[in-house]
Each structure stands twice: as structure tokens, then as C-alpha cells.
């Protein structure tokens, strides 16, 4: 797993967005605050009808915690897992500063969520699948998510790259 890579990224990040590698692929510049707010608002909008005070949310690949900081106040529990211990330590500090008592953090990769011994109403993965090793890993993660979802819960995979456009995207970045 790429734990060391993400620990180094998080350890050297100067702000919340860079913790998770949130930089423009074309110029390596950080995304603007407006772009980041729009990204978080989009995820919130997609989950709006499922957000209740009793909701139990799991974010797989919590990264910088941008989404968590917005959604956690709207639910009963907000759990997040990430392979980077440094990311989780930084998020824990942010949560304590904001007196967020419902945030739970776990040092697991996406295929290790079965270690979290509870069910969720919402499972969210945003800008994570592009880091998966392939289809089989994705299948395993989907199976694990289904096992963790409670009753009529929802699993949201957001901000997914279009695989059919991978080669043209890669070429455009190199130009």
C-alpha cells in the first residue's frame, strides 16, 4: 500500500487541500478556495436527502477532511478512514479544535473497512478510486462497502475519472 507516500505528502503539506494532493494537474498549483468550496458543496448536495441527525457516515479516503468538516455536524457519527496516519492525526487535531465529538478516524485502506465493526447509512468515496490498483481492488472495495451499509443506506462514489478518457487526459497533462 502507499502509506509512506501519503504520509510524506501530508507531512509536507502547507494547507488542508495539499494534504491529499489537491493540485491542478496542468500547472501543479493549489486549487482556489472557491474551487474547493464548490467541490465540497457538490458532495453535500448529492447526499442532502440522506443527511439526518441520526445518520452514520463513513468516508473512505477521508484525506484532508474537507467534506468531513462540513458533513459531520449534520449527522450522528462521521467515521473516516485513510491509509495515512499523519493525515488522521492532523484531522484529529482539527476536530478537537472545533469540538467535534462525533468524528471517528481509522488507519485503514479502502479494502480494510471491514475492521470497522459497525454499519453505516452513508458511505462516501470522493476522489479516491483513481488511486486504486485496478478493477479487482475496486470490486473488493465495493463488496466491502455493501457489507458495511445498513438497510436502505447509500454508497456514493464521487469525482471519478472517466477511464475512456484516460489516455487523452494523460496526453493533455504532458503537453
Each PLM stretch: what is its role?
Residues 77-82:
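Conserved SAM-binding motif I beta-strand of class I
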Residues 131-144:
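A short, conserved alpha-helix within the catalytic core of class I
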Residues 64-75:
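Conserved SAM-binding loop of SAM-dependent methyltransferases across substrates and taxa
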Residues 54-63:
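Conserved class I S-adenosyl-L-methionine
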Residues 124:
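A conserved beta-strand element that flanks and buttresses the S-adenosyl-L-methionine
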Residues 35-54:
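Conserved alpha-helix/loop element of class I SAM-dependent methyltransferases that forms part
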Residues 84-86:
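Conserved SAM/SAH-binding beta-strand->alpha-helix loop
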Residues 152-160:
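Conserved beta-strand signature within the Rossmann-like core of class I S-adenosyl-L-methionine
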